[in-house]
Amino acid sequence: MTNCEKDEEFVCISCVEEVRYSFVSHLSEALRRKGINNVVVDVDIDDLLFKESQAKIEKAGVSVMVLPGNCDPSEVWLDKFAKVLECQRNNKDQAVVSVLYGDSLLRDQWLSELDFRGLSRIHQSRKECSDSILVEEIVRDVYETHFYVGRIGIYSKLLEIENMVNKQPIGIRCVGIWGMPGIGKTTLAKAVFDQMSSAFDASCFIEDYDKSIHEKGLYCLLEEQLLPGNDATIMKLSSLRDRLNSKRVLVVLDDVRNALVGESFLEGFDWLGPGSLIIITSRDKQVFCLCGINQIYEVQGLNEKEARQLFLLSASIKEDMGEQNLQELSVRVINYANGNPLAISVYGRELKGKKKLSEMETAFLKLKRRPPFKIVDAFKSTYDTLSDNEKNIFLDIACFFQGENVNYVIQLLEGCGFFPHVEIDVLVDKCLVTISENRVWLHKLTQDIGREIINGETVQIERRRRLWEPWSIKYLLEYNEHKANGEPKTTFKRAQGSEEIEGLFLDTSNLRFDLQPSAFKNMLNLRLLKIYCSNPEVHPVINFPTGSLHSLPNELRLLHWENYPLKSLPQNFDPRHLVEINMPYSQLQKLWGGTKNLEMLRTIRLCHSHHLVDIDDLLKAENLEVIDLQGCTRLQNFPAAGRLLRLRVVNLSGCIKIKSVLEIPPNIEKLHLQGTGILALPVSTVKPNHRELVNFLTEIPGLSEELERLTSLLESNSSCQDLGKLICLELKDCSCLQSLPNMANLDLNVLDLSGCSSLNSIQGFPRFLKQLYLGGTAIREVPQLPQSLEILNAHGSCLRSLPNMANLEFLKVLDLSGCSELETIQGFPRNLKELYFAGTTLREVPQLPLSLEVLNAHGSDSEKLPMHYKFNNFFDLSQQVVNDFLLKTLTYVKHIPRGYTQELINKAPTFSFSAPSHTNQNATFDLQSGSSVMTRLNHSWRNTLVGFGMLVEVAFPEDYCDATDVGISCVCRWSNKEGRSCRIERKFHCWAPWQVVPKVRKDHTFVFSDVNMRPSTGEGNDPDIWAGLVVFEFFPINQQTKCLNDRFTVRRCGVRVINVATGNTSLENIALVLSLDPVEVSGYEVLRVSYDDLQEMDKVLFLYIASLFNDEDVDFVAPLIAGIDLDVSSGLKVLADVSLISVSSNGEIVMHSLQRQMGKEILHGQSMLLSDCESSMTENLSDVPKKKKKHSESRVKKVVSIPAIDEGDLWTWRKYGQKDILGSRFPRGYYRCAYKFTHGCKATKQVQRSETDSNMLAITYLSEHNHPRPTKRKALADSTRSTSSSIC
């Protein structure tokens, strides 16, 4: 071990004597338990001894300073702690961790006296945090962040291993550590060994176990590792093991690849004493099984934070290269490495020393194309242990089947003569392949290394076994015509030697070329052929100039060719090995002439082949499982498929010329016949286990009794005896159906007759019916309803009356909306939850049940308020009725009984009410004009606050019809104790998306409440959070959550607090409840009082921000207004303390609409802002350019290309957005002129790297600047002058 390595593993703790034998002793012991050596230096010793100790501090890899937070920093302490910091600045490799222990009253004094610049965050003891938790935080920080780069992300995994060990019964405990190459198995095992080895009588860590046992032998390894320093020679292996039989032994076998070799060492663990621990690391899961280890820990990759930290440390990247660009680069590297520590660190070291970001990006692209040897070697060592078949399957997946359905891959590979069920499991066990959501996945690194193995076989493209790169395939297949002596000659040299090719996948998205007629002639071993277009917006242009294809390889298992340009496949092609034919959008008229052997064919997809007329040859494919002929519009016949016993899926949808199907396959599972001309279908062959047909048929004679589901049947000639097992009968939109037989003896659960406009009567309902749909029928009266009914939907029907439903205890949903002839209802079920009868002419409504949650109507006398009330366009409702419902709503959401709060939050978080507005609701509910309202929270509500109830009055335009699309966005803003702006945004629909809402003809009032809407900054219920006001702003939105235009306005609004009540909530106390401390206050009055109490210079700063700098960065604003002697930092704090502004977490100044409005009103009402600033503003007024009218502005577009290292165009720009562009590797940045708010400049530009040359930038300028180009020195000064003058 080198001295450097020793220094890295050494930690020095500096402290005062007061904490040395208490807190610091626990910290020192905790570090030792993690295998970290440490010493403690007392700063209270005299200068001579401290000078000697200073040498230890300088050599330490990490220095921990424990500062006594409850003691005044004396000069002696400060001097010695400053020397500790000086050691760190002299030794750049040393890290310093600071701890402020004790009360934090003197924290600021310590921080001001010592210079902590460039150091990590300071750990501080807290009242709510015990010393043990603080020690745990410090140890983790030292262990991962500072101790040594290789252990980043190890700490949490180490705790999981410890937990796995501790859960095992006393005896010999075993743990297997499993993971892909480079994931950190060895590092984790070393960390476990360092931490636990001191607790055992003997321990050994055998690195690269297979190699070690091969070189030294089993006997020497045991003696050397477990009995070090033993002078006597032990002649027998049994004697050596006898000496260890009574000892607690820790054995770590690292990177075991041969399970038999590992098992020979352990031999059933009989020779180990009780309490011993065996740890094996391996990338092959079968090793653990054969070694008898059942507890297996799978090592996961680093999370995003850990991965970024490791990358920046490995690359020695400094933040001065630009934080945004560094963020983008590190994210790309991390995403590519997918948390693999080896890959992240190797890529980081490869990028180390690159000074320019463009150099780093270029180097990274090269590394992706050609992975570093260290990474390739780590993965290839696993690849070399595979059998030939396993290697072929791995390479097929790496090159062709990433993300494909595992059953699809297995089917193709079985056709190739492999045994993929077994061999894919082997690849999974060796961490080369994963199966997730029934799809096959490879780590991006693993895929690229697999492809690198292919490319490394030979430099000749035609000699490679698998091809996937479009440019190389084009080179091999392209038709080249040269004219010599007036005669065309075609060269085929490129195709020679291509006998080795087994797979060819060509993406034609960006290609345009002609294929050789004999392109595939020499590819005798080609198994997999796929020519496709990954971009659906691009039409591929690949043709045969001679109009023919001479041959296809007879070894093909997969033939996937989209937009195949010829009328048939080559006649000499023998498809006996084909497993799948997938040729959508082809020009095929028929597959081939004559009879072919199709015994291996499982799937054929010829969808949207509009010229296809003949598929009779498919009858020869006796093992066929899927036929997809969707959209084959010229296909007239579908052959009798009764002998295709394995056929499961047939899709003939869109085959408009097919009029009949002679036979249905006996084992059919899905039959798609939408858009066909089929009028009749024989179902006598349908088996009991295939119970679903998806079709659009007009007649099915002779329904089988096993059939359980039919969709869109128009006529049924079957008797009820044939429908004994039918459970779902959907006759939706069967407009010709006039009657149905008595169905009382059927076992139907669902009966859908909606849209059967000619059906005017029904004789009886099935006794077990649960769902009944009668919407749009002509039925006027219905027989007795079954007691099992759960849903009754008669929307828009001709019903005049209903039987008494009081005994239907299972009925939950009743929809009678639009039943214009319905006059009376005798009673409602007691468990009813949803009731809709808007648009009816009911004379009398019975008592509503207490269980009701949703009501879309009016007239409830229930004391139990539903969750949703809708009184849309009920203008005849009296004002008192509307006010009563509003009061009920507010009462229900304002006071929630104690003990039920959490249940309501989980089960019923929202409530709503809507009704036409009345003019004097303002007086009743203290509504404020406008779309904003300020709320002051009573101190007593802080511990009982649940959420808010909101009243919003919306004005609708007269010609607006689709009110269903309208919703309200509520933005709640407040300031935390640090003056930072916090916000919650929730969106409420005025009407549910499925509700049919007529044209709204008047302003409506909506009540929304959400008990999940509770302001919080993640800091608990700290009272300082509520020191200011809470502001609510409301915006009309559509279903896409976009703001509606000015024709939709929020006229008035108000807010109520929802809290946990402790008293009676009955309606008799409603007046008392609402008279408690009014929640709404006059926003303008509160703001004006706060403004009037400001100092004059703070008033000026507020007016500047209100006029110019809302939503701008503090760092941007400060230099612009520094020229008029305003103290920005202290002024912003003053404004934030009185709730006139807020500062967001990313440093933006935030004002809500009420604050901006008041500022502008004050500004316009004053003839001067401040006498001290009058001369400055008047002097600069002439510098402000006059604004041009909008209609005279011209939008100018100019595109230029410049090198990425160019200094720019000398204009001052601010970036305001960035987004990924479809089909481009690089994102596009959006910039606006920095003088937009001072000069009204409309100039913008868009910047994107060139696709052909990443070192070039394509810049698109939109509109011209309306001011002179500033010099570098004058840019900021000009901005300041124009800002100060434009406020006047």
Swiss-Prot record:
Ecotypes susceptible to C.higginsianum or R.solanacearum, such as cv. Columbia, contain a protein with a premature stop codon, while the longer allele found in cv. Nd-1, cv. Wassilewskija or cv. RLD confers resistance. The gene is RRS1. SMART domains: WRKY. Residues 1279-1288 have a biased composition (Polar residues). This is Disease resistance protein RRS1. Interacts with PopP2, a R.solanacearum type III effector. Interacts with RPS4. Residues 25-26 are annotated as: Important for interaction with RPS4. A motif (Nuclear localization signal) lies at residues 986-1003. Belongs to the disease resistance TIR-NB-LRR family. The TIR does not cause cell death, but can suppress RPS4 TIR domain-induced cell death. The TIR domain is involved in homo- and heterodimerization, but other domains also contribute to the interaction. Transcription factor. Interacts specifically with the W box (5'-(T)TGAC[CT]-3'), a frequently occurring elicitor-responsive cis-acting element. Also acts as a disease resistance protein involved in resistance to fungal and bacterial pathogens, including R.solanacearum, P.syringae pv. tomato and C.higginsianum. Heterodimerization with RPS4 is required to form a functional complex to recognize AvrRps4 and PopP2. Contributes to temperature-conditioned RPS4 auto-immunity. Residues 5-146 form the TIR domain. Residues 170-421 form the NB-ARC domain. One of its GO terms (cellular component) is cytoplasm. It comes from Arabidopsis thaliana. Residues 1267-1288 are annotated as: Disordered.
